């Protein structure tokens, strides 16, 4: 078959125009084009048709060294990547090339990164809780198996550490596979995560097929085209795991979904589209919907997705985080004020929500304890202005007791993480759901009113808090 060959006519940053001289043979939108620059394969994705013979493309690699007149070949299909068992333990980029120095990904099947979401009849609506072993999450914003969870937070409040702890806890306690998509984040963090996974046995270098995770990276230094598509590459790998062998439960981590939106905004501006609110692309909701609607559970298997969402300037009303809210089953909001108190994970217990915190799903006891904890913390929050102006002495005895319990609850919501052992020196703790509920039930009922606040800080179960209290007296 004769190849459809074009020539580069214009290069502006990550946007490349290609002219095809074969009349009537203009490649389709989203097709991948290939050209070679000093033996390096460069992939271009068609975004627009301009006139009768020219296509405008977004580059997936750096355009340095490209010149006008270079030959470009139409591959005849969208970007396609290797999927299946062979991707386990490997790191690949947006176009499916291995970037871990371990050679080609052999024997795997190939799949396009563009697919339609499963139909209504294929989707599953069962609701089961996924226990994470993190107290504040399991109690106040429980995760659903096959649900979508958003981690919202500004810069430096602990989104990536929380994601790494979830990978550690859930991937070990849970038999399924994990896919991690690094979208526009720090290369150093991606490298650290890879080596931690090797150390913890999640990645097996000797026998890669025994690994539990596949990694897909498009980090901060990549062009906007790569960052805008790498989440789709990761999702395609996750879908292949979900649909194989009569179904699997898959965990899909994205760090960071905001960078997906940000890259889309850069691409949109380069293509000359008129921006919408706050300078974002006019297709913001569509882009987000196309990604999120594919992250779903079918009757065969499930994809449980955890997405870190950077909040620009800590403003939750910014269009990028606000657009993702609509797609999520649970939202975990990380608060700078709580991080400043030294309480980690810095989850805001009043802002974080979950659709499954419902007595019909989690049970009456869990629901009542969670609501009581939130009620005590809300009362404490409303009393803080009075305390700041008049001091504790002006409060009624009942309010003083509420404040005392709230401060203990606040500290008991902290927990030492396995992945943070290296820099805290404290052994990480996985807390079962029953222990979490029992501990907070005792606190709300006043069973531990006589213990010092410090006993509840950075412990796992309530038994550990009681032991710690003995050493403090």
Curated annotation (Swiss-Prot):
UniProt GO molecular function: ATP binding; ATP hydrolysis activity; proton-transporting ATP synthase activity, rotational mechanism
Transmembrane segments: none
Compartments reported by the entry: Cell inner membrane
Pfam families, per the entry: ATP-synt_ab (PF00006), ATP-synt_ab_N (PF02874), ATP-synt_VA_C (PF22919)
Catalytic reaction list: ATP + H2O + 4 H(+)(in) = ADP + phosphate + 5 H(+)(out)
EC number in record: 7.1.2.2
InterPro entries listed in its UniProt record: AAA+_ATPase, ATP-synt_VA_C, ATP_synth_F1_bsu, ATPase_a/bsu_AS, ATPase_alpha/beta_chains, ATPase_F1/V1/A1_a/bsu_N, ATPase_F1/V1/A1_a/bsu_N_sf, ATPase_F1/V1/A1_a/bsu_nucl-bd
Superkingdom field: Bacteria
Gene Ontology cellular component list: plasma membrane; proton-transporting ATP synthase complex
Membrane topology value: Peripheral membrane protein
Gene3D superfamilies: 2.40.10.170, Bovine Mitochondrial F1-atpase, Atp Synthase Beta Chain, Chain D, domain 3, P-loop containing nucleotide triphosphate hydrolases
Main location: membrane
Keyword annotations: ATP synthesis, ATP-binding, Cell inner membrane, Cell membrane, CF(1), Hydrogen ion transport, Ion transport, Membrane, Nucleotide-binding, Translocase, Transport
Sequence positions that bind ATP: 153-160
Quaternary organization: F-type ATPases have 2 components, CF(1) - the catalytic core - and CF(0) - the membrane proton channel. CF(1) has five subunits: alpha(3), beta(3), gamma(1), delta(1), epsilon(1). CF(0) has three main subunits: a(1), b(2) and c(9-12). The alpha and beta chains form an alternating ring which encloses part of the gamma chain. CF(1) is attached to CF(0) by a central stalk formed by the gamma and epsilon chains, while a peripheral stalk is formed by the delta and b chains.
Its biological purpose: Produces ATP from ADP in the presence of a proton gradient across the membrane. The catalytic sites are hosted primarily by the beta subunits.
Family the UniProt entry places it in: Belongs to the ATPase alpha/beta chains family.
PANTHER family, A to Z: ATP SYNTHASE (PTHR15184), ATP SYNTHASE SUBUNIT BETA, MITOCHONDRIAL (PTHR15184:SF71)
NCBIfam families xrefs: atpD
Listed name of the protein: ATP synthase subunit beta
Organism: Rickettsia bellii (strain OSU 85-389)
């Amino acid at each position: 078959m004769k190849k459809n060959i074009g020539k580069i006519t214009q290069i502006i940053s990550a946007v490349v125009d290609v002219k095809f001289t074969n009349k009537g043979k203009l490649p389709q939108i989203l097709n991948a084009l290939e050209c070679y620059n000093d033996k390096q394969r460069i992939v271009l994705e068609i975004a627009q048709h301009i006139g009768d013979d020219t296509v405008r493309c977004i580059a997936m690699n750096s355009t340095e060294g490209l010149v006008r007149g270079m030959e470009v070949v139409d591959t005849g299909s969208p970007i396609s990547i290797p999927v299946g068992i062979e991707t386990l333990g490997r790191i690949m980029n947006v176009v499916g090339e291995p970037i871990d120095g371990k050679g080609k990904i052999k024997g795997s099947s190939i799949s396009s990164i563009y697919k339609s979401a499963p139909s209504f009849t294929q989707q599953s609506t069962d609701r089961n809780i996924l226990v994470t072993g993190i107290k504040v999450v399991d109690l106040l914003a429980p995760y659903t198996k096959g649900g979508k969870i958003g981690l919202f937070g500004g810069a430096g409040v602990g989104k990536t550490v929380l994601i790494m702890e979830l990978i550690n806890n859930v991937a070990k306690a849970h038999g399924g596979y994990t896919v991690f998509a690094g979208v526009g984040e720090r290369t150093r963090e991606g490298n650290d995560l890879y080596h931690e996974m090797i150390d913890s046995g999640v990645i097996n270098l000797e026998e890669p097929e025994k690994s539990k995770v596949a990694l897909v990276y498009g980090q901060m230094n990549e062009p906007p085209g790569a960052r805008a598509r790498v989440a789709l590459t990761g999702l395609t790998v996750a879908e292949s795991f979900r649909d194989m062998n009569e179904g699997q439960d898959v965990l899909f981590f994205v760090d960071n979904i905001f960078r997906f939106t940000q890259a889309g905004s850069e691409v949109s501006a380069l293509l000359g589209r008129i921006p919408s609110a706050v300078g974002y692309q006019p297709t913001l909701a569509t882009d987000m919907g196309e990604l999120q609607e594919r992250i779903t559970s079918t009757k065969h298997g499930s994809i449980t997705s955890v997405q870190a969402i950077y909040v620009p300037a800590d403003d939750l009303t910014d269009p990028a985080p606000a657009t993702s809210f609509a797609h999520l089953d649970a939202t975990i909001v990380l608060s700078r004020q709580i991080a400043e108190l030294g309480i980690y994970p810095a989850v805001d217990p009043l802002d974080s929500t979950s659709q499954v915190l419902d007595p019909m799903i989690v049970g009456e006891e869990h629901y009542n304890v969670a609501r009581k904890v939130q009620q005590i913390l809300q009362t404490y929050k409303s009393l803080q202005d009075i305390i700041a102006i008049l001091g504790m002495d002006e409060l009624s005895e009942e309010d003083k007791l509420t404040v005392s319990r709230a401060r203990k609850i606040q500290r008991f919501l902290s927990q030492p993480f396995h992945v943070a052992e290296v820099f805290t020196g404290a052994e990480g703790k996985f807390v079962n759901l029953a222990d979490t509920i029992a501990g907070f039930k005792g606190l709300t009922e006043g069973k531990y009113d006589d213990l010092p606040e410090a006993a509840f800080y950075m412990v796992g179960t309530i038994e550990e808090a009681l032991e710690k209290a003995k050493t403090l007296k």
